[in-house]
Design a protein with these regions (language model features):
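Hydrophobic transmembrane alpha-helical segments in integral membrane proteins
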Residues: 1-15, 132-136, 261
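Structural signature of hydrophobic alpha-helical transmembrane segments
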Residues: 2-12, 59-71, 204-215
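Alpha-helical transmembrane segments
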Residues: 10, 123-142
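Cytoplasmic-side transmembrane-helix entry/capping segments in multi-pass membrane proteins
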Residues: 30-40, 62-68, 87-99, 236-242
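Hydrophobic alpha-helical segments and helix pairs
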Residues: 82-132
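A mid-sequence, solvent-exposed acidic-amphipathic segment
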Residues: 152-196
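Interfacial loop-to-transmembrane junctions
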Residues: 224-246
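Juxtamembrane boundary at the C-terminal end of a transmembrane helix
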Residues: 249-262
């Protein structure tokens, strides 16, 4: 079944959510319920596109499908945080980006129809690995943004960019929820890798596995700092940045290291 129709519908709804929130932001209205509901509807439609795409492709994820799933996860975190904290302005960027991923996934047809379907455990490992990478990278980005926001709030007058950002406590809540989600998804990815991937500790994957475990510890230490001291501390932000850097090296830099260093 073609993904084009549901993909276009999801993309339209998500772009409408971003545009609606942008209009509300220009009016000085931080919260817009219509934008929020459009974001929720778009998130559900994007996940439906992923499920349908995986079914059509024998359970094998494509880059477009995994990008859509990652975008939906980040959108879900923003939407969940928006229920209690004024971070709706982030929908201006997150919703359209998720829509673009969904559009790409719906336009690019599956390429592995001739291959045997993946078993459920391997498919879960692949999906959670991609989600973990995105969530950890997102938490590291938020940690950098929070550190910059902390520094700039001490300066007067405030710059337009700082004034446009959500309040500090709302950003910290979003960061905390992102770290919790990243740690949980990374835990599932490592668990399924250890028990269901035969060559998980093989030499060609050992460096990725070690860096992923170190990133897991980084996220765990960041959460431990929160529960021990409360709030979002400087050490928590730095630890999240280190964890994100380690996982980025594991996923993006490993090939370059193997080819040019080793």
């Amino acid at each position: 079944m073609s993904l084009l129709v549901p993909g276009l519908l999801a993309t339209s709804v998500l772009f409408a959510s971003g545009i609606r929130q942008l209009s509300a932001f220009k009016r000085g209205d931080g919260r817009d319920l219509t934008s929020l509901w459009l974001g929720i509807a778009g998130c559900v439609l994007s996940v439906a596109v992923v499920i349908q795409g995986l079914g059509d492709n024998g359970g094998r994820p494509t880059t477009g499908l995994m990008g859509t799933l990652l975008g939906a996860l980040l959108l879900l975190i923003v939407l969940g945080s928006s229920l209690k904290h004024p971070v709706n302005a982030l929908l201006i960027g997150v919703a359209p980006i998720t829509g673009l991923f969904t559009l790409v996934a719906s336009v690019i047809s599956p390429v592995s129809n001739h291959l045997s379907p993946l078993n459920f455990e391997t498919a879960v490992h692949i999906a959670t690995s991609v989600l973990a990478y995105g969530a950890v990278a997102y938490s590291g980005t938020l940690a950098i943004l929070l550190s910059w926001q902390h520094a700039k709030l001490k300066e007067r007058p405030l710059t337009p960019i700082i004034s446009a950002l959500p309040p500090l406590d709302a950003m910290e809540h979003l960061f905390l929820r992102t770290v919790q989600t990243a740690w949980l998804v990374l835990t599932i990815a490592l668990f399924t890798g250890v028990f269901y991937v035969e060559d998980f500790w093989a030499q060609q994957l050992a460096h990725k596995t070690v860096l992923s475990v170190l990133a897991w510890w980084g996220m765990a230490i960041a959460l431990w700092q929160h529960f021990r001291r409360g709030g979002v501390t400087r050490i928590m932000r730095k630890t999240a940045i280190v964890g994100a850097a380690l996982l980025c090296v594991g996923y993006l830099g490993s090939k370059a290291v193997l080819e040019f260093v080793l």
